């Protein structure tokens, strides 16, 4: 009896696809740190990193070597187990969330019927990582940063989910591939769900703690926030995890609102991976542009903006979408 049954082969292929996708995401996340510094230098009319290699391209290699060889030091006053676990959870939760994102019609790790719910579950785990990091550090600035992060993330995750319910109501499924295929037969959701797109993008920036919602890490106020006591690879996991979060939110925006791997008007369907990559790169650059152009608001303004503006907007969008879908349902229309 052969061990290589069709079921075993499917499992092996799924594991290999997962390894390829996760390695590609980690590499892209590391490269984004260099890309961000070059773009910020260009937009702010300064040089940026340009000394290591041609056009500074080897700067990322120098940074990685420095990170690998720095001492992995644990301060004597920290809770060692939780202190070590926090960066692992932060990076792992974001990486695992990629398994439900379809990149091309044939390439993806897992085709789950609860794909969106799986993403929300993984996004929720990242809150615990930040809270663990601040609490286990026994540092008042780290604790304050983690409490800020928890309150901000919980607030914005409320309408991070509600912003997508309009998409789910129209498609009738939480499956990512179903959502992409629905957009191929109809309008991309950027048009009928424009307000949902706006609120999801704002919530995505806040959940990834990117500027202008980087209150948990505000250098001027909190001395780098919840990872002030981290060094070496532990700090590197938080650092790369932030860029992985940018890629994740950008890929979700493309999948849910911009037709996924489909080109505009069905142009060149054979270039599905290229379309997905180009659209994702556009939103990644938009994340970086926000950092270069918008000042950081006060923490109370960030929280007021979420509850007093974004949440009502998502509820109105959901109610209007549900009413339109209900009105157009044949059974209801016949009555």
From Swiss-Prot:
Topology of this chain in the membrane: Multi-pass membrane protein
Transmembrane segments: 11-31, 81-101, 114-134, 154-174, 187-207, 238-258, 270-290, 307-327
Localization, UniProt: Cell inner membrane
InterPro entries, per the entry: NADH_UbQ_OxRdtase_su1/FPO, NADH_UbQ_OxRdtase_su1_CS
Pfam families documented for this protein: NADHdh
Enzyme Commission number, as recorded: 7.1.1.-
Biological processes per GO annotation: aerobic respiration
Keywords per UniProt: Cell inner membrane, Cell membrane, Membrane, NAD, Quinone, Translocase, Transmembrane, Transmembrane helix, Ubiquinone
Catalytic reaction annotation: a quinone + NADH + 5 H(+)(in) = a quinol + NAD(+) + 4 H(+)(out)
First-tier enzyme category under EC: translocase
One function term, GO molecular function aspect: quinone binding
Gene Ontology cellular-component annotations: plasma membrane
Subunit (UniProt): NDH-1 is composed of 13 different subunits. Subunits NuoA, H, J, K, L, M, N constitute the membrane sector of the complex.
Role noted for this protein: NDH-1 shuttles electrons from NADH, via FMN and iron-sulfur (Fe-S) centers, to quinones in the respiratory chain. The immediate electron acceptor for the enzyme in this species is believed to be ubiquinone. Couples the redox reaction to proton translocation (for every two electrons transferred, four hydrogen ions are translocated across the cytoplasmic membrane), and thus conserves the redox energy in a proton gradient. This subunit may bind ubiquinone.
Family note: Belongs to the complex I subunit 1 family.
HAMAP family associated with the record: NDH1_NuoH (MF_01350)
Protein name: NADH-quinone oxidoreductase subunit H
Organism of this sequence: Pseudomonas putida (strain ATCC 47054 / DSM 6125 / CFBP 8728 / NCIMB 11950 / KT2440)
Lineage: Bacteria, Pseudomonadati, Pseudomonadota, Gammaproteobacteria, Pseudomonadales
